[in-house]
Amino acid sequence: MSFRDLRNFTEMMRALGYPRHISMENFRTPNFGLVSEVLLWLVKRYEPQTDIPPDVDTEQDRVFFIKAIAQFMATKAHIKLNTKKLYQADGYAVKELLKITSVLYNAMKTKGMEGSEIVEEDVNKFKFDLGSKIADLKAARQLASEITSKGASLYDLLGMEVELREMRTEAIARPLEINETEKVMRIAIKEILTQVQKTKDLLNNVASDEANLEAKIEKRKLELERNRKRLETLQSVRPCFMDEYEKTEEELQKQYDTYLEKFQNLTYLEQQLEDHHRMEQERFEEAKNTLCLIQNKLKEEEKRLLKSGSNDDSDIDIQEDDESDSELEERRLPKPQTAMEMLMQGRPGKRIVGTMQGGDSDDNEDSEESEIDMEDDDDEDDDLEDESISLSPTKPNRRVRKSEPLDESDNDF
């Protein structure tokens, strides 16, 4: 139910001239009395001669009233109503009532009944009179047809009255014969007795049929009871294959438990394998990064040593001729040791293994003192670090090459 439908319904009923005021609050709760009154008024407005009982006291009367209204509107006005919603007599019944009121309201609008209230009352009275005259016309036509048929039959009977009068007079004047009367009475009694006998035979047949049916019913009951007992017996007996079935079921349960355990173990091992691979990959990445870091530091140290070596060469040219190569080595050896010690500060807890060889074979003891060992917990880190440190022998070669011009300069002096 919508507010617009309820408002339109109240306005249409007011325009049609419904004597009672309909409020919008009347259909908040079921109000079958108001709905029945409105339906009866609308039906009378559509057909004044309609005879529909207005009794709605009991449930059966209300159902009959709703069905009669719906049947009348379907046959006369071709309006299909929902009896269930009408019987609810609440807001949903307003939509069904709108179907009737909208037809009457549109008819009133087409006939120019949109004037004032006084004009509406006059037109309504005229409409009521016109409806009653139409009903009187129908009744007059029916009475005229009945009068015609009855007059024709009366004329025929009056034409036969002369002959019938003579026959009636003769029958009255003729004396009654007792023998013939008794004969007719006996014949009638005999016919009645035969009919009574036939009726008794039918009753006996009915009794026999009843006995036969009772016997069949009893037989069916016995069969049913016997089948029920047989069913109970079959249900109580344990089948022969149940032992094998239970044994197979236990085996299947064990197999399933084993499968479930193995599946869980397999899943766990796969997870452990994935974790191991991930850890190995992380260690490999860490070793790779460490190697790159060591290489970068070694390159920086090499550049620094080359730069410091060039400065030392310029100082050696200015020194005196009696300065020996051993003194030069003693000056240069502390520098790479200091660089390697700086490199080891970035990697605490590890030992670097490597050699820093000089240009001359006589300085083996000094070169052995400059070796720094590096040891790691993992073999891969040791190999990578050994490979990185193997690059270090190139440094003293360059220093040796730089020291050759010094010998030539000594010879010049």
Swiss-Prot record:
Compartmental location: Cell projection, Cilium; Nucleus
GO cellular component: actin cytoskeleton; centrosome; ciliary base; ciliary tip; cilium; intracellular membrane-bounded organelle; intraciliary transport particle A; intraciliary transport particle B
Protein name (Swiss-Prot/TrEMBL): Clusterin-associated protein 1
Keyword Aminoacyl-tRNA synthetase found: no
Superkingdom as given in the UniProt entry: Eukaryota
Coiled coil: 198-291
Gene Ontology terms: biological process: axoneme assembly; cilium assembly; floor plate formation; heart looping; intraciliary anterograde transport; neural tube closure; smoothened signaling pathway
Biased composition (Acidic residues): 312-328, 360-388
Annotated source species: Homo sapiens (Human)
Source lineage: Eukaryota, Metazoa, Chordata, Craniata, Vertebrata
Subunit structure: Interacts with CLU/clusterin. Interacts with UBXN10; the interaction is direct.
General function of this protein: Required for cilia biogenesis. Appears to function within the multiple intraflagellar transport complex B (IFT-B). Key regulator of hedgehog signaling.
